[in-house]
From Swiss-Prot:
Cofactor: Mg(2+)
Name of the coding gene: trpD
Listed GO CC annotations: cytosol
Reactions listed under catalytic activity: N-(5-phospho-beta-D-ribosyl)anthranilate + diphosphate = 5-phospho-alpha-D-ribose 1-diphosphate + anthranilate
Lineage: Bacteria, Pseudomonadati, Pseudomonadota, Betaproteobacteria, Burkholderiales
Name by which UniProt lists this protein: Anthranilate phosphoribosyltransferase
Length: 343
């Protein structure tokens, strides 16, 4: 079913939903660059003001997946992504990227989808390069990396070439649009399990239901009530969980797991080198907020990756993996393996 751009804009103005097939059609036009910049920007802003629905986001994510360059692995049902929306303005170090090494060392196969910094001081790609990883990998090399090390990193621009058709409009608008929440929904390896941080509390329930419709297996969508797009030590964390086909929403508190409430001030960074230093500090088991917040998020990842039956069990495994040095060893193994492919 198609829809004229004018009708779609009218729906947005009147706060009425654009139906699934109609949204598929509009999104394909956007991704092919077949809408004028004026219509494209009006549509993106109309959706933002109206507030995108679960159905609209689901359809848009399906089209982005359709246009993506895939990474083919034998068992996408076992893979876990740890990709957040970003945009929380907290300027903390790369917590989920660090937690990735802990989860992988605990046996969770990781297919992480990431990018350079947009609003933070250091994006996942920035800090991984600072740590010595080579990110210029083909899809086949990423798949080989997953098979050999348990981790693959997919640099978003290399897998979403069609995004160039909306890049100029997004840049000129300079505000958040639906594309800011689509990235974590469009893993090129089709990872069925996910730990996703979101920048706004409303997105917890929205994103987990989108992933339910997209066929995900086990998902945790989190938002720290202090504003972080991670599980936080500074406040309670809102969680939306999809497991066994059922969505639940609840809160977790650091003290529930024997962790101290701590301010995030000590983990703020201004560049990728400062972030790199905290990544190493956390993985070297230095007592403090960096290690504990990484362990908390890694615990959630281990649980979402189905290597533990509960969050407390997963958190204990995360701390063990850090303290015995296997998480730090996983970092070195991953970086060394990616450098094999340097041209």
């Amino acid at each position: 079913m198609t829809i004229a751009a004018a009708e779609a804009l009218t729906r947005c103005i009147e706060h009425r939903e654009i139906f699934h097939d109609e949204m598929l059609h509009l999104m394909r036009l956007l991704m092919r660059g077949e809408l004028s910049p004026q219509i494209a920007s009006a549509l993106l802003m109309g959706l933002r003001v109206k507030k995108e629905t679960v159905g609209e986001i689901t359809a848009a994510a399906q089209v982005m997946r359709e246009f993506a360059t895939p990474v083919v692995t034998p068992n996408p049902q076992d893979l876990l992504d740890m990709c957040g929306t970003g945009g929380d303005g907290s300027h903390t170090f790369n917590i989920s990227t660090t937690a990735m090494f802990v989860a992988a060392a605990a046996g969770v196969p990781i297919a992480k989808h990431g990018n350079r910094s947009a609003s933070s001081s250091s994006g996942s790609a920035d800090v991984l390069e600072a740590l010595g990883a080579n990110l210029q990998l083909t899809p086949e090399e990423v798949a080989e990396c997953v098979a050999a090390t348990g981790i693959g990193f997919m640099f978003a621009p290399a897998h979403h070439g069609a995004m160039k058709n909306v890049a100029a409009v997004r840049k000129e608008l300079g505000v958040r649009t639906i594309f800011n929440i689509l990235g974590p929904l469009t893993n090129p390896a089709g990872a069925a399990n996910q730990l996703m941080g979101v920048f706004h509390p409303d997105l917890v329930g929205i994103q987990v239901r989108v992933l339910e419709r997209l066929g995900s297996r086990h998902v945790l969508v989190v938002h720290g009530k202090d504003g972080m797009d991670e599980a936080s030590l500074g406040a309670a964390t809102m969680v939306g969980e999809l497991k066994d086909g059922v969505v639940r929403e609840y809160e977790i508190h650091p003290e529930d797991y024997g962790l101290s409430m701590m301010s995030n001030r000590g983990i703020k960074v201004s560049n990728r080198e400062e972030s790199r230093a905290l990544v190493i500090e956390a993985l070297d088991n230095v007592d403090g907020v960096a290690r504990d917040i990484v362990a908390l998020n890694a615990g959630l990842a281990i649980y979402a990756g189905n290597k533990a039956d509960s969050i407390p069990e997963a958190l204990a495994l995360a701390f063990e993996t850090i303290s015995n040095g296997s998480a730090r060893a996983k970092l070195e193994e991953f970086c060394a393996y990616t450098r094999k492919f340097q041209k």
